């Protein structure tokens, strides 16, 4: 019997669009720059350059997995999408890291700490908003985290979505429940930070680092001045991603948790 229960989103049908739209331009560069900055700060404090065990869940095109493997870390990559994993393996092979990364093409629920062990860093970036049961995620990540390990989590920020619609005059959209186009890469479940913080607290975790991702880029209606210089634009995104109130308007929020 076919179940009518909601299932986690698999991007096998949209991998090329994901590759082009999400990481084919500045949006993806800004996202990676903020996450990489935050992780480097925490990793430098925790491991002092020593190799650590890393689990990249929902690892997508594998940019972070490959980069961390090149640094000598022990990386395990996971994604429910086989087509995404193929793209990630292409990138790893190009950088001579294919055989240095462990590959798991399965739902995250199949990742067992009894089989895989526990990890010093568990990464989960921009996937919680695609889950059927997002409230169960942080507990699962905590089970995979080593005692003194950290979790890197990003989520689609509902406050950003509200603010963007206010700027565009889409007032009617704010009066009804948000529904994303099934063929769109816009997540169907944005979250208020307060909701995510409740799950964090329920699992006895603390926030070591918080940042906004794309705190102004997504609100630009026309590029001008410093917007036309990619290096300067990313530099300003990095600068204000850590500063209130700007970071609270990031399209995504990044938490590093312990």
Annotated model-derived regions:
Residues 63-110:
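Class I SAM-dependent methyltransferase SAM/SAH-binding core
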Residues 135-150:
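A short glycine-rich, Lys/Arg-flanked "PGG" loop and its adjoining helix->strand segment in the class I
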Residues 123:
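A conserved beta-strand element that flanks and buttresses the S-adenosyl-L-methionine
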Residues 1-60, 63, 67, 95, 150-177:
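Conserved class I S-adenosyl-L-methionine
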Residues 209-258:
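A C-terminal cap/extension of S-adenosyl-L-methionine-dependent methyltransferases
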Residues 180-195:
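Acceptor-substrate binding/catalytic loop of class I
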């Amino acid at each position: 019997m076919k179940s009518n229960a909601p299932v986690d989103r698999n991007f096998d049908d949209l991998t090329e669009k994901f590759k082009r739209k999400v990481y084919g331009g500045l949006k993806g560069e800004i996202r990676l720059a903020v996450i990489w900055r935050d992780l480097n700060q925490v990793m430098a404090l925790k491991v002092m350059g020593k190799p650590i065990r890393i689990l990249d869940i929902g690892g997508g095109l594998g940019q972070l997995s490959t980069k961390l493997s090149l640094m000598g870390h022990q990386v395990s990559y996971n994604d429910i999408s086989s087509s995404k994993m193929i793209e990630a393996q292409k990138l790893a092979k190009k950088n001579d890291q294919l055989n240095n990364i462990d590959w798991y093409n399965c739902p995250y629920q199949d990742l067992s700490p009894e089989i895989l062990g526990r990890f010093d860093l568990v990464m989960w970036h921009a996937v919680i908003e695609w889950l059927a049961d997002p409230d169960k995620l942080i507990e699962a990540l905590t089970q995979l985290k080593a005692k003194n390990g950290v979790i890197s989590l990003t989520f689609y920020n509902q406050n950003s979505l509200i603010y963007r619609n206010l700027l565009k005059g889409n007032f009617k959209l704010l009066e009804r429940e948000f529904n994303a186009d099934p063929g769109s890469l816009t997540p169907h479940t944005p979250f208020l930070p307060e909701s995510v913080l409740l799950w964090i607290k329920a699992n006895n975790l603390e926030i070591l680092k918080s940042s906004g991702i794309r705190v102004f880029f997504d609100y630009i209606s026309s590029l001008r001045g410093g917007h036309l210089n990619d290096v300067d634009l990313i530099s300003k995104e990095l600068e204000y991603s850590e500063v209130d109130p700007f970071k609270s308007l990031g399209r995504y929020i990044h938490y590093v948790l312990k």
